[in-house]
Regions:
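Gly/Gly-Pro- and Ser/Thr-rich, intrinsically disordered tail segments characteristic of DNA damage-repair
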Residues: 1-198
Length: 199
């Protein structure tokens, strides 16, 4: 499709290259600037401290934290979603960074809401994405979700082990965990495969 088999330019932007086959595929070399990332992470963290105490903030990575907002909802007279949005808008106003949030009834559900759910939530007028998840919502929305590697702490190795035993979804794993001792798929299989990590 390239006229005269010559490229007319180059782009590292996938949609642009797909739309225009006469563009050569290019790439960008972006050297890591850890001190810069730490500086911005510190700025965002200082916004959290305007709303919650440090003992309620659990850093997960340079760009992600868990916040136990339980005791603040009544103080601020806000729902979990409203409280998350308040913090996210403060981050945007203070730093110019658009943040997202996952809200859950436990850490795991908050992380799944963030990692999988927030990607499918339309952004509001400020680019904010907030996803909420409780146990029933998890069953409805993610019981049949694939691939397993989308889930927090399920890497390629774990997924391969599970799939080798016919377990392809979280629903499969949940059913396995309640299988009878005489069934092939039962709690013992999960402990045999993963030891204490089966919990």
């Amino acid at each position: 499709n390239t006229p005269g088999r010559q490229f007319t330019g180059a782009s590292s932007h996938d949609p642009e290259v797909r739309r225009n086959p006469s563009l050569a595929l290019d790439y960008i070399v972006a050297p890591p600037r850890m001190a810069h990332y730490i500086d911005w992470s510190t700025r965002v963290y200082s916004v959290y401290l305007k709303h919650v105490a440090p003992e309620d903030i659990y850093p997960y990575s340079i760009d992600e934290v868990f916040i136990d907002a339980t005791s603040y909802l009544q103080t601020y007279h806000l729902s979990a979603r409203e409280f998350a949005r308040k913090i996210i808008l403060d981050i945007l106003q203070t730093t110019g960074i658009t943040a997202a949030a996952g809200i859950g009834t436990n850490l795991y559900l908050a992380k799944v809401a963030m990692d999988i759910g927030a990607k499918h939530v339309p952004a509001d007028e400020y680019g904010v994405r907030i996803a909420e998840l409780d146990e029933m919502g998890y069953r409805r929305s993610f019981w049949t979700h694939r691939p397993l590697t989308d889930f927090w702490r399920v890497g390629k190795g774990y997924a391969a082990k599970l799939e080798a035993h016919g377990l392809y979804t979280m629903g499969d794993i949940a059913r396995c965990s309640i299988g009878q001792p005489t069934d092939y798929h039962n709690e013992e299989l999960l402990y045999k495969l993963f030891g204490v990590n089966a919990e």
